[in-house]
């Protein structure tokens, strides 16, 4: 089966499961951004030229210099262009937590902007998971442990950046993530704008305190959205418009002159309200991988549920399955204090346990003629940097570039599937330049793999080396990873 056939067969598989957005990759200016400074520059530039709408959602907005520059850019755009409207949505717990460095929170930083421009120009919303709502009144960190609004999407007019990166100083400087930019995509930008609006409406709206020096940072005017209404609103967003897709060319497309070369399928996952759309679409993606194809997975926090491990094991059984995750020296929780200092050890423990689990799942695929290929786990280690990238790259074989990629906020872990709210997009493309750009993404990430701690689960010598590299993992980590694994 050639690349075009894989494109069409995968399209047929995905079309009944998610809303499809066809486009021409070159005309839409769809491209990956490769590093934090480029992400920051692109976002600030888009905001500075906004003419109608700015809709941003993330876990939180930091309070450092680069974040203040971003806020100043929003302020200036609102001041010089009366038609611009801004909508911001953040996690209810994380946005209230004060920075240990600056002593202020996301809400504190944005309140002056809200006072200046008013709620008609700028609307600020907090979205909390049901478990976190029950923890209201307790320290914000406890609400974050229970579950967070983890989606990241940045819409400016008809531009869109989908990413796993928050709006924070380190994500603009030296925390490597993944970022896909669409420079001209009115339909997909509309979809994400509507998603952000829906999530904001299901959360709380921040209002201006009646007293300038009120001890309360904010008040709210929106009631808690019942779970059934929340789920209904999100399901209406992802529902396919056309579920009887045959050939690729039969999907609706505004330019009848030439068929689209790329399709985007956005997904939403919110386990706490029973919204498993992303899980369903990911299952279909992995089912579409040819037996001699390749699956490459990146995640900052490696903690996949057993059913996802089984799906990975069954995908491309005689091809490549590779995972790229954080080395302990570039881990996001490196340097944490107290009980949180065990988080890195827990992830190292989970990684070690994953290898035999994957090997066992693959053993059932063995035959007399073919032996399944092993799993390769690489550790990203870069001095002075932390690692936060996530995504999937699918190839039909090792000889052709990636034809499908998944990008967004999910870490493909137990927490992503069961506790947090996530959004991703599946990009299915036949456009050569975009496919090679996806390959370059993976190449840039994998150049920082630390060979001393990377291994194949079928390679005993390398596996022993990886086990020795985790010898500093504290004994308590195994117990903690079992007890709190669902929260990691």
PLM feature spans:
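Hydrophobic/aromatic residues located in beta-strands of well-ordered beta-sheets
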Residues: 86-88, 321-323, 405
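Terminal interaction modules at protein C-ends
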Residues: 193, 220, 224-250, 255, ...
């Amino acid at each position: 089966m050639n690349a075009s056939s894989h494109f069409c067969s995968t399209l047929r598989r995905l079309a009944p499961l998610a809303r499809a957005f066809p486009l021409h990759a070159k005309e839409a200016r769809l491209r990956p951004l490769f590093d934090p400074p480029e992400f920051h520059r692109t976002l600030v530039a888009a905001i500075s030229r906004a003419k109608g709408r700015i809709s941003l959602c993330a876990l939180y907005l930091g309070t450092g210099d680069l974040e203040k520059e971003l806020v100043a850019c929003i302020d200036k755009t609102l001041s010089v262009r009366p038609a611009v409207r801004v909508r911001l949505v953040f996690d209810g717990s994380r946005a209230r937590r004060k920075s240990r460095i600056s002593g202020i929170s996301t809400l504190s930083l944005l309140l002056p902007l809200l006072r200046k421009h008013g709620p008609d120009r700028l609307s600020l919303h907090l979205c909390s998971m049901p478990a976190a709502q029950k923890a209201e009144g307790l320290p914000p960190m406890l609400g974050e442990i229970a579950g967070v609004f983890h989606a990241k999407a940045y819409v400016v007019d008809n531009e869109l950046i989908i990413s796993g990166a928050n709006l924070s100083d380190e994500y603009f400087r030296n925390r490597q993530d993944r970022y896909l930019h669409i420079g001209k995509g009115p339909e997909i930008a509309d979809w994400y704008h509507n998603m952000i609006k829906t999530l904001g409406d299901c959360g709380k709206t921040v209002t201006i305190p009646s007293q300038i020096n009120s001890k309360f940072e904010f008040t709210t005017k929106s009631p808690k959205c019942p779970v059934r209404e929340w789920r209904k609103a999100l399901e209406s967003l992802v529902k396919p418009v056309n579920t009887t897709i045959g050939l690729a060319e039969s999907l609706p497309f505004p330019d009848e002159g030439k068929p689209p070369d790329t399709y985007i399928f956005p997904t939403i996952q919110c386990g706490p309200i029973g919204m498993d759309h992303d899980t369903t679409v990911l299952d279909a993606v992995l089912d579409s991988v040819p037996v001699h194809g390749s699956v490459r997975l990146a995640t900052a926090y490696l903690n996949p549920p057993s059913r996802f491990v089984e799906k990975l094991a069954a995908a491309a059984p005689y091809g490549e399955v590779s995972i790229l995750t954080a080395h302990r020296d570039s881990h996001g929780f490196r340097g944490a204090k107290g009980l949180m200092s065990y988080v890195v050890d827990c992830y190292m423990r989970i990684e070690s346990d994953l290898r035999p689990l994957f090997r066992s799942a693959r053993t059932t695929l063995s035959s007399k003629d073919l032996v399944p290929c092993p799993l390769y786990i690489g550790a990203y280690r870069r001095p002075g940097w932390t690692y936060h990238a996530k995504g999937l790259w699918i190839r039909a074989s090792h000889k052709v570039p990636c034809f499908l990629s998944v990008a967004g906020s999910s870490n493909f872990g137990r927490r992503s599937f069961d506790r947090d709210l996530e959004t991703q997009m599946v990009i299915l493309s036949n456009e050569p330049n975009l496919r090679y750009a996806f390959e370059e993404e993976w190449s840039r990430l994998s150049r920082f793999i630390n060979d001393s701690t990377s291994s194949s689960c079928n390679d005993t010598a390398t596996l022993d080396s990886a086990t020795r590299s985790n010898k500093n993992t504290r004994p308590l980590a195994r117990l903690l990873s079992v007890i709190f694994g669902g929260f990691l």
